[in-house]
């Protein structure tokens, strides 16, 4: 009888140990799956606003900064003002920019500006991102699409010189993106449209579908892949665009 009880106890202990091990394995598996989707550190994808380094689109409003009071000069506080165009540096184009009665920048939904985004690397030799070029990349299941182009490779968002030969989104690619229902499109120079285009068709196609365009992203240190994206433009009532802070963090899968 004692032997039977001893065997029974050992069997119960063994079952308990195996059960605890299985629970631990399941917990570890859940943690591993969770950690596999944990984003890494934040990357600042915002170009610094500085008259010495910020490119201004040809014909757009110049940028100026002025200190009204300066503690370095003996004042009791430091106080400044600045003047710049709505499309300076990293900024967001709202539908109102090219769509009559389109939403102004203060009415662009946060759901469009925050969420998963895919960064696509466009070869340095490519200036026109047309439908054929777009379809060379895996973009169709992306909620938001951002293009890293020659502008990042050449550091153009840190140069005050305006470069006309920046890479742009061709209208046929814009149509594909709009038809696919992407929530946001981003580029790494101060316009998504070809310089000197006879008509702003890329803007009209995207903004006409309510898709905000983020222009002037600083992507020099950003690699192709999937990211969490947060873009927060200034909440300016009734205007067509505004400078924004943009941050990203890589999704590790």
Features from the language model and the residues they span:
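Bacterial N-terminal signal peptides that target proteins for export
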Residues: 2-12
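Active-/binding-site microenvironments in catalytic and ligand-binding cores
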Residues: 24-253
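Bacterial N-terminal signal peptides
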Residues: 11-21
């Amino acid at each position: 009888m004692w032997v039977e009880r001893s065997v029974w106890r050992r069997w119960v202990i063994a079952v308990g140990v195996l059960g605890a091990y299985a629970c631990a394995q399941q917990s570890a598996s859940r943690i591993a799956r969770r950690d596999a989707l944990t984003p890494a550190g934040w990357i600042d994808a915002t170009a610094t606003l500085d008259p010495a380094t910020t490119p201004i689109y040809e014909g757009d409003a110049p940028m100026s900064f002025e200190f009204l009071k300066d503690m370095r000069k003996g004042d009791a506080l430091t106080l400044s003002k600045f003047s710049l165009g709505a499309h300076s540096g990293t900024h967001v184009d709202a539908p109102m920019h090219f769509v009559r009665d389109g939403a102004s920048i203060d009415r662009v939904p946060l759901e469009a500006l925050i969420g998963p985004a895919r960064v696509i690397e466009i070869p340095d030799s490519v200036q026109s991102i047309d439908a054929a070029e777009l379809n060379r990349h895996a973009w169709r299941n992306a909620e938001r699409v951002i293009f890293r182009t020659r502008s990042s490779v050449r550091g153009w968002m840190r140069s005050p010189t305006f470069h006309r030969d920046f890479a742009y989104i061709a209208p046929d690619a814009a149509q594909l993106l709009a038809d696919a229902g992407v929530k946001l499109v981003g580029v790494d120079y101060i316009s998504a449209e070809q310089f000197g285009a006879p008509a702003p068709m890329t803007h009209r196609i995207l903004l006409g579908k309510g898709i905000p365009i983020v222009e002037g992203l600083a992507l020099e240190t950003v690699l192709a892949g999937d990211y969490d994206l947060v873009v927060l433009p200034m909440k300016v009532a009734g205007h067509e665009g505004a400078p924004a802070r943009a941050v990203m963090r890589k999704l590790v899968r």
